[in-house]
């Protein structure tokens, strides 16, 4: 059976810590979508690890780690991540169906961002997915056969010829790209496998599989705050499509949310706090992007969005992250509905334009940092947790009270 860990906000919820905390109980840990635009930060034995493509199970020697087919892969960046770890043989596997991000994709991404102003990381994620959908991309499996790779490269060069000047690719682009593959492909090829068959077989044998998503539900290309979204499907349903596991294989869906809200880049954010309180949350929560170092926009917990995300993903349990960031705040707000043009909205709309938050205020607490038992939390903190559970209709099974792995309350 497989369990899914999915972000149910705008990403950066703390999925990495949760996967790292529970990975020891699984045989496989699988990253199922996105690219190196995402980032997991894990603190292990006092050392901070920033992972962008590698599954979070790499810190456990017994885990097999898979990058599955719906992930788009920068082979240069993956090589750098691989070099930071030892003994990855028979522990890391990359789907032969996953698509390769080319330097051209990053150039195109930056070019388009100038006019679209979506707030992308400009790492080529969207353009790589564009080529995938246009059936013109290069897949990881193509790297295993020089003849096939050459065919794919020639087709790529022909397709981009009209855009070379616009995307500032340079006169030596063809030579440089071939050299790029010669440099990085040999380091990657030993890890490329038919991971779909691997996972189907593992599931049939009853091995335990953990599927981890990137970004968050509200950035989903179909169900998120379009057009201010990522280029992949970020919900739990994507885990099945990417891995080849059918929906019957899914057991638990663990939704990850912070005790407040954050968002990186542009796009609507009804519960954003632009007062000094927002700055306080950003500073105390160290809310700066793992990948881009951009400051995250911060605000209060949005239960309208949270209920929507829980429903989309079929969440069976929740993990509440960064409760300690709210320590010492006298009055804590929670968005319980929106107001738009005089109308109260309790369902998440397809367009958040003109939506203003309707808040309910709770009394704060002094300290939750480092607490590892529910009974040791102050009454006001416990009341906050119970309110979230009641409103969302999903049990909170885990509460994080610091970045450290051990500072976790299990319920």
Curated annotation (Swiss-Prot):
Query: Where is this gene product found?
Result: Cytoplasm
Q: Its GO CC terms?
A: cytoplasm
- The positions flagged as active site in the entry are 12 (proton acceptor), 40 (proton donor)
Record keywords, A-Z: Cytoplasm, GTP-binding, Ligase, Magnesium, Metal-binding, Nucleotide-binding, Purine biosynthesis
State where Mg(2+) binds: 12, 39
Q: Which residues bind substrate?
A: 290-296
Q: What does this protein do?
A: Plays an important role in the de novo pathway of purine nucleotide biosynthesis. Catalyzes the first committed step in the biosynthesis of AMP from IMP.
Name of this protein: Adenylosuccinate synthetase
Origin species: Helicobacter pylori (strain Shi470)
Q: What is the lineage of its organism?
A: Bacteria, Pseudomonadati, Campylobacterota, Epsilonproteobacteria, Campylobacterales
Q: Which gene encodes it?
A: purA
